[in-house]
Structure formats: structure tokens, C-alpha cells
């Protein structure tokens, strides 16, 4: 018998059955990552997160799932709907809570409908709609989903897209081979930035999560917090969660470190999927020219080349990434708005937004670091 369950945490779920549904090894929807955030204080109600996962069981075996959350705000999502919320509430509605299918705090494209067939994916989408209407919510949203999941959503869901800057491995054998594909100006600039970092006197390396000591995890987390403190934001990921990642994911966590007399003074933390490297967190207590680019981008590119990974996704936003070999790549989201008048207004606005974002892509590609320009994604 097939049953759909709604879960307020993943404690009752078999980790192996959950992870078996993730075809691409995406670490941000794996059991250890999602359950770790629940267990180690990252998903707090006062931060606006309440787990509301969907799980489909057949004869007591998990056959499909959707990580989902009731959201009391739009923070930590990176698909911005603040203007939608303001408009809906000015009209007298309650936009929050809403239902969100996502990897919390992670603007990373990946599977959001964890299933091995299209039928179960459509059941998950229907489940999101049913929960939205059962709870009397304003809306449901699914952010940063893969193209393979898009057909599961019918026309009632609004389509939205944006751009991130990703690096693609063209079979490079080493970093210099990558540089040869760039324009001369970009190649010269990257070499200069790498030289600045190497001449700093800092010990720079990529370190596997399984080798990081407890004291180094404390140092890494303190650097992560520093970045958020500088911007006046709260750092949601806790030190116990960082330690948990090192224990549970091991070498699927990689950290680019800069050390001074053995002490970590700057870092960039990465996660590794089957074919993709994901850049997530950066922090530093030193100001060294070129160091940010070395840790966040160039060591990551070298890691991808050495390990034959096909894609490097260094994080959301940042046009400066283009000058360092990253090209605009389309990301997708889907949105279900219950109120039909509100749906129509947003649907019309998204048509104009799409035209603007297509024009933005054309403008960006006029400044491609590669010659000749690559085909459109």
C-alpha cells in the first residue's frame, strides 16, 4: 500500500533509503546534511524554519520524498519574493507562513523531488499543493530545482529563472590548460592574483574534511561567523553542525585553508557531489591581495581538474566570477500561489522579469572571458 506522510523531522527516516533516492550525489539534500541541520540547531523557529517534509512509502519502504519547510519569512532562500510578500500583505493577505521545497540556506541547484520515476515526482508536487491548501497557506515554492524535475509541475505553477556563475570542465589536464582558453587579459589577471596569494607567506592548501582537527573546526567556524558579523547577519550554521559534516561526510567536505604559523587565518569550505564541486562559506581575518580568489575559485578549479569533476558552482551572485572563468548558468524555481488574482499579477510581472533577465544574459556574454564564446545554456 502507498501512503504519503508529512514529517516534522527526519528522525524516523532510514538514512540509506533516503540517500538511495538522490541520483547525483548532491550533498545538500542528503540525509546527513538535512538531519544534521535539524539536530544541531540550524533550523530554528525564530529563524523562520519548521520542517514539513513529504515522504511517500510503499509497503513501509521510502520510495519518494521532498525536503520541505514551513517558512515564517523569506530569509535564507536566495530566490527573492520579498516584493510579492509586501504586495500580498498590503492587499490584506497573510503571505507567511508559506511552504518551501529547498535545501535550507543553500542556493545550490539540485534534486528537490527525490524519486526514481516521474509518477512519484508528480505525486510529490500534488502533495505540496494539497498541504498548502490543507493548511490554508498563501503559497508553495520549490527553489533551485533541476531541469529533470521541471515536467512534474503543471501550468498552475509559475515559472521563474535566474542566473548563477558556474565553471565547466572541458577535459582540462591541468590549470594552465584552462588558462589557455581565456582571453589574454583574463589569463594575465588570474596569474597575477595567484602570484599575490603565493607570495604572501601563508601556507595555502586544500584539506579534506576527514583530516580536520576539532580545534581547526572551531577556527573554521569562527571565520565563517566573522563573514556574517561583518554584514550584520546571523550565522545559521552552528559549530556542532560543522563538526557533524566532517564526521558524517568526510572527504565530501573540502576546505581551502590559508595558515599562518599553523593557525588557520582564512578559509573557503566546499562540498563535493558525484560530478560537481560546490563552494559555500568563506572567512578571513587577514587582508591579502588575491587570497579570496585563490581559496574560493582557483583551488576549487584545480580540485575539479585533478578529480575529473565536471562542474564547479562557487555560490550565488557575483559578476566578478566571470573574469575568472565562470559563465552564467540558468537556475530554476516554481511557485504555486493560491489566490488566483495574486497569481495573475505575479505571472504578468514574471514575463517582464524574464525579458530583463534574458537581456542581462546577453549583456554578460558580451564580456565572456573565453574566446570564442560558448553556446548558450
Describe each model-derived feature in a short phrase:
Residues 1-377:
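N-acyltransferase acceptor-side catalytic subdomain
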